[in-house]
Amino acid sequence: MIAAPADLASLIKAQAYGLGFDLVGVTTLGPAETAPDFDEWLSHGYAGEMDYLQRGAEKRRDTRLPFPGAVSAIVVGLNYGGTAPNGPVARYARGDDYHDVMCKRLESLHGWLEQEAGRAVRGKSYVDTGPILERDFARRAGLGWFGKNTNLINPDLGSFFFIGALLVDLELEADAPFEVERCGSCTRCLEACPTSAFVEPGVLDATRCISYLTIEAKGEIPGEFREAVGDLLYGCDVCQSVCPWNARFGQELREAGFQPREAIAGRDARTLAREILAMDEAAFRTSFKGSAMKRAKRRGLARNAAVVLGNVGDHTDEPALVVALEHDEGIVREHAAWALGQIRRTGPPTLE
């Protein structure tokens, strides 16, 4: 016999915490409350090259559409290290691919739920992998509020956590949504953005965001933003790292799978950039197998690496960039030429 919705929800939460999730909440399915905002955001072109967001827009507007028959969503959060220092690679991508880590645990939760229910439970897991508005689910499940930097902020964890959802065909008691926005008058995230990517509080123009430019954008990084990229090779944590909620409540990384991988650990921006520029396709696949960084592909990471070396401005990096002028990807050659120009305009290296 299946437990009552309230009892089953409590059992699910206990099991999810036991699997290592840091946050768990439950919500019902229906029209997404943020759908109008999402549509307006798309209409302004703020999604840039992320055409998949437009293609899945209809399903994102109603949380019942992605997985017909589902009536409840179990929403989870998993910390990825709010106290770690900033670096050339965004915190979320330094370890194993979060999609793999989260999905495996949600699948385990699904399997346990079927045993607990005593019947087959139709369910589907989403970890940034399908047409759902994860933040909408999470706020409705009581996990946090939308910060001015557009990230979901939890009062006990900050914002450095992944969001996942398991949609199921079971009626569960829903948690109260998080109704109070607690950013107050703080605007640190808006002011700290290197490219002024926030149109207004809570609205991000992705085409100006360093995370978008170094990961999602497949073409050239516009000249107006290259210097602002600085030594950020993949992604950007600036708007989160300055947030007082992360300063006060950000937690240390406990998940072994999210510890920095060998290809990243202990390497500064210059070292990592030179190594990436020198990689052929086989070396790239070996180094970034099972990493979220593979999303940018070799050409994207090499493009970023050239920009980073140009911004660092060390003349000893010129040989690596000269070699990159013969790179098999034209976009890398172009950015390498730009980087050499940046370095050489500072004059010849000082000989001691």
Q: Where in this protein do the model-derived segments appear?
A:
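Structural detector for internal amphipathic alpha-helices that build alpha-solenoid repeat scaffolds
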Residues: A302-G313, E334-R345
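A beta-strand-loop signature enriched in Asp, Gly, Thr, and Trp
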Residues: Y212-A228, P244-M279
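Auxiliary alpha/beta "docking" domains used to position bulky ligands
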Residues: M1-R182, I221, G230
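Alpha-helical adaptor scaffolds
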Residues: I264-R299, A306
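Iron-sulfur cluster-binding cysteine motifs and their immediate structural context
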Residues: G18-F21, R188-Y212, K218, L232-F258, ...
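Short inter-helical turns and helix N-cap capping residues of alpha-solenoid HEAT/ARM repeat scaffolds
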Residues: R298, D328-G330
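Amphipathic alpha-helical repeat scaffolds
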Residues: D231, R274, R303-V307, V322
